[in-house]
Amino acid sequence: MFNYSGLNEECGVFGIWNHPEAAQLTYMGLHSLQHRGQEGAGIVVSDQNELKGERGLGLLTEAIKDDQMERLKGYQHAIGHVRYATSGNKGIENIQPLLYHFYDMSVGICHNGNLINAKSLRQNLEKQGAIFHSSSDTEVIMHLIRRSKAPTFEEALKESLRKIKGGFTFAILTKDALYGAVDPNAIRPLVVGKMKDGTYILASETCAIDVLGAEFVQDIHAGEYVVINDKGITVKSYTHHTTTAISAMEYIYFARPDSTIAGKNVHAVRKASGKMLAQESPVKADMVIGVPNSSLSAASGYAEEIGLPYEMGLVKNQYVARTFIQPTQELREQGVRVKLSAVKDIVDGKNIILVDDSIVRGTTIRRIVKMLKDSGANKVHVRIASPEFMFPSFYGIDVSTTAELISASKSPEEIKDYIGADSLAYLSVDGLIESIGLDYDAPYSGLCVESFTGDYPAGLYDYEANYKAHLSHRQKQYISKNKHYFDSEGNLNV
């Protein structure tokens, strides 16, 4: 099976302007975004004269140590990044923010997401003489900015943003301003907050604003960029060719439950999805349990709707990184054994409804079902609070091949047998859309559900040929039976 090259990320970005402890607050903000990436972190700081940065591999506490933080003190502006990346792209050179020193200015830049035309842009830039120092998509936009003929940095940024495709947010720092930008579909979230002293904050999630005691100001919407400087804050559009398609996986899995995306609290959405799942797929049992942590809200909703007790049948070791975003399959499988254990006294002899947020590869849920049955569970009915994860994601989630997706080749009945469950049911696409409750005048009410439908709102670009060449029979069947709203370049099909 062909493996798509490229750097698929699910990361967290943070920025702050005009605070005497900018680096320290950035560190705190990144700590609240640690769930978005555990393989590296970095901070770039700025004042009126210079930019400097520190970065490292591992969790934030491993990547940026006390002596590094000391070197970042005394600066008023900062951006920061926590990173997840596919294996093979884990070197220090790819840890963000990337920092560039040019003859006329210095720039720090970091991003969350994936640029689906980065490969072709990179090839064209190299033909023009560009030299790349990392394999990160982020470096592509820096080359585009520097090669622009636009008269100002802001104009060059706007011009460059129009050339890149995919799901992304950027945080960019110069000595003059802090910039943030969101893709034309708002697939990846970016929010603005304000502290009591007037300091502005940029972050991937509202939880990073809340942790600093700041107030939420606004979401940055599809095709918008924000400029924060000593004059204040300005939000502008760099393109009017926009269709809102916020990643459903942000609500389902990635975001913290205390975050709010497009006005919808993540915990409330997950609980609503559990209730909807119970309405769509009830089953007789003694109790409901959830897979910690991202499934607990949905499990509580399912239990409440069906009128069963919600029990803690699984306990998680909170100090083990999340398995879905571990870079290799071997590490993911080892991680399940280390991080979860069944509570035997709770599950022994019981018929259990096990709620999980998604089935991607199937390995994790298979081990959990076995763990519960080994601990004495009589029956385990699996309920998934999202639709079948049938199609690759190219917008910033590390699932970019059909071969990785169990639902691409197996039916729910076949997956039920594979994971050893007594029954298996998924939330419908319509049920997911209703549970999240967005009301944009856009396909899927403003959600990006590409992994469940094969409908890609930002298009496919560099991935198109190989994606189409490796569609499974089951994927082709789904596509032939269901309406698609977007073409391969992300244009709306009229």
Swiss-Prot record:
Which transformation does this protein catalyse, written as a reaction?
5-phospho-beta-D-ribosylamine + L-glutamate + diphosphate = 5-phospho-alpha-D-ribose 1-diphosphate + L-glutamine + H2O
Instruction: Specify the species.
Output: Staphylococcus aureus (strain MRSA252)
Q: Does the keyword Magnesium apply?
A: yes
Q: Which GO biological process annotations does it have?
A: 'de novo' IMP biosynthetic process; purine nucleobase biosynthetic process
Q: Where does Mg(2+) bind?
A: 294, 356-357
Which Gene3D superfamilies does its entry note?
3.40.50.2020, Glutamine Phosphoribosylpyrophosphate, subunit 1, domain 1 (3.60.20.10)
Catalytic residues, chain numbering = 11 (nucleophile)
Give the gene symbol.
purF
State the name under which the record lists this protein.
Amidophosphoribosyltransferase
What job does this protein perform?
A: Catalyzes the formation of phosphoribosylamine from phosphoribosylpyrophosphate (PRPP) and glutamine.
Q: Which family does it belong to?
A: In the C-terminal section; belongs to the purine/pyrimidine phosphoribosyltransferase family.
Is the Metal-binding keyword given for this protein? Answer: yes
Query: Any binding details for the cofactor?
Result: Binds 1 Mg(2+) ion per subunit.
Q: EC number(s) of the enzyme?
A: 2.4.2.14
Q: What residue ranges constitute the propeptide?
A: 1-10
**Sorted UniProt keywords:** Glutamine amidotransferase, Glycosyltransferase, Magnesium, Metal-binding, Purine biosynthesis, Transferase
Q: Which Pfam families match?
A: GATase_7, Pribosyltran
Ranges that cross the membrane: none
